Amino acid sequence: MNDSVLVAPSLSTAQTEDTFEFQSYGETEHSRSYLGSDVTKDNLVELVSAYYSVPELIQYFEEHPQYKKITLQFPDELVLDSSIVVQLMQQELVKAEDETSQSFNTIDTDEVLHNEKSCGNCSGCDCSSKIDKTETKRKVWILADTSYSSCCVDEVASEHVKGDIVVHFGDACMNAVQKLPVVYSLGRPVLDLDLVVSQFKLKYAAKDQKICLMADAPHSMHMKSIYDILHDKEGYKNVVYSDINQDMLQSDTHIVGYNNAVEHDERLRKCVTCGNRNIYAEVDVSELNEYDLFHVTIPKDPHLLYLTTKFQSVTLYDPSSGMLNEGPFPSMMKRYKFMHMARTAGTIGILVNTLSLRNTKETMNKLTKLLKENGKKHYLFVVGKPNVAKLANFEPIDIWCILGCGQGGIVLDQYNEFYKPIITPYELLMALSDEVTWTGQWITDFKSIINQIENEVNDSDDMEQDILSSGTECRSDEDEAPEFNAVTGKYVSTSRPLRQIARLEIETPVEEVRASDSTELVKQFSQTVAIRNTVSTSAAFLQTRHWTGLGSDYKDDEDGEEDGATVEEGTAGVARSYQFDELNKKT
């Protein structure tokens, strides 16, 4: 007989304190393909320092000692390098401060005593003129939660810590911000030029084709080298290339680790400006739509759509895989459809996903004024990163208009995930015009939109002045032209709700009007929905819902009982320990 002690089987999994701790990752190594293939633990710090031009960045802050609170903004794909960059900056900045303080302590005492504004602290007094050395110390913060539209400077996040300056790392759109000075560290990624040239030659066999070379901001440093190989060695005489448009930078904006190669080549000249890029070539570039675009890296969908409207064709080169991508790309046909849907939309939701960009508030004010003049309702939403769940909470909105960066801050909704269409201010401007126009352009610059809105308002004012000066009578009781949805073909009666309120005449018995203290929230007068005798599109939408809120089924009770339900005590406690659980444990 076996003398071993029988142990009952475990009926549940053993749970200790370690069970509820966060999962610890076993792998500490991360992929840093932008640093090259020879990355080791020994040379990682050196490569990161060279990639972000940390020595030049430190030199900039030594030359500008007024910036005490420094905020660093990293995108998600580069945030793994943030700790190394901060450590390098703090070491050098502290060393520079120590040298400055030592040089200050060596000042001759007689020079301090002769200063009438200072006692020189010769007797150990604690007067207000004593210099507080703690104020000279610099602090560095890493800004988090910038995964959406990371190409833009997050000025609002920097103001949370009262930052003096923002250092933006990685790809950037170069859009101007409201207040703070900005330093860009684009990075110096490693790129296999021979592989790029070989893929280029496979795509473009004819050497007389008109081709433009372009890349994101970090990889733009390689465009001049690729141009020299293709133009001088391979014989592509009609090839041109792009570089960063430094003319759009503000006076308090600086780029570290960037050199414009055009300054050292007298053959090249700037021909055309394409957004935040300048096109350089030896020959004249008349129209970009005659050129094919060869773009290194995969741009975001909004910027990619912009490029498809500027060039004859677009071919993308992925540096991570070394392969070409020729589509499918975002199409303007869906934008044309959404523009027509906006023409008959009665309620517009304006999405503001950033408050840092310059001219955002002015564009917002111009749009709201234009919507009111066209008789449409609008609501403002500052939601940060839009998603399906957020926007689905506002069902009365007919269409959304998003205010964001044209490079990565606009939602295109390629897979129809959102319940309502999302358009841009330029598309909304075309939808509000009297004539149906479609230019096929993709304009996202706030300055251009503001100018077009002002021109639209001025044209309407001039038309009204011409009517008044000609003496033509405008009949206010004349019926407006019916509007139909261009997508569904149905008649739309609520496309201009604010304009209809002034002309609406509701006939109802006086007794019903006096009985406005009814328990019903929404009442329907002669096929017109009103709240407290006031027309409302929200009330009209509420009527279409099966469930209209608590107490909505009170009047439809079949039993005719006027007594409410009996109030009973509900469940109390927190999720892990409700009250009835505690009672069960005691019993």
Curated annotation (Swiss-Prot):
Cofactor: [4Fe-4S] cluster
Example of a GO biological process term: protein histidyl modification to diphthamide
Pathway the protein contributes to: Protein modification; peptidyl-diphthamide biosynthesis
Record's GO cellular component terms: 2-(3-amino-3-carboxypropyl)histidine synthase complex; cytoplasm
Intracellular or extracellular location(s): Cytoplasm
Lineage top rank: taxon: Eukaryota
Cofactor note: Binds 1 [4Fe-4S] cluster per subunit. The cluster facilitates the reduction of the catalytic iron-sulfur cluster in the DPH1 subunit.
Pfam families cross-referenced by the UniProt entry: Diphthamide_syn
UniProt keyword list: Cytoplasm, Iron, Iron-sulfur, Metal-binding
Binding site for [4Fe-4S] cluster: C152, C173, C405
GO molecular function terms attached to this record: 2-(3-amino-3-carboxypropyl)histidine synthase activity; 4 iron, 4 sulfur cluster binding; metal ion binding
Biased composition (Acidic residues): 555-566
Database matches in Gene3D superfamilies: Diphthamide synthesis DPH1/DPH2 domain 1, Diphthamide synthesis DPH1/DPH2 domain 3
Stretches for region Disordered: 549-587
Job description of the protein: Required for the first step of diphthamide biosynthesis, a post-translational modification of histidine which occurs in elongation factor 2. DPH1 and DPH2 transfer a 3-amino-3-carboxypropyl (ACP) group from S-adenosyl-L-methionine (SAM) to a histidine residue, the reaction is assisted by a reduction system comprising DPH3 and a NADH-dependent reductase, predominantly CBR1. Facilitates the reduction of the catalytic iron-sulfur cluster found in the DPH1 subunit.
Family that this chain belongs to: Belongs to the DPH1/DPH2 family. DPH2 subfamily.
Subunit (UniProt): Component of the 2-(3-amino-3-carboxypropyl)histidine synthase complex composed of DPH1, DPH2, DPH3 and a NADH-dependent reductase, predominantly CBR1.
Name this polypeptide is given: 2-(3-amino-3-carboxypropyl)histidine synthase subunit 2
Gene that specifies this protein: DPH2
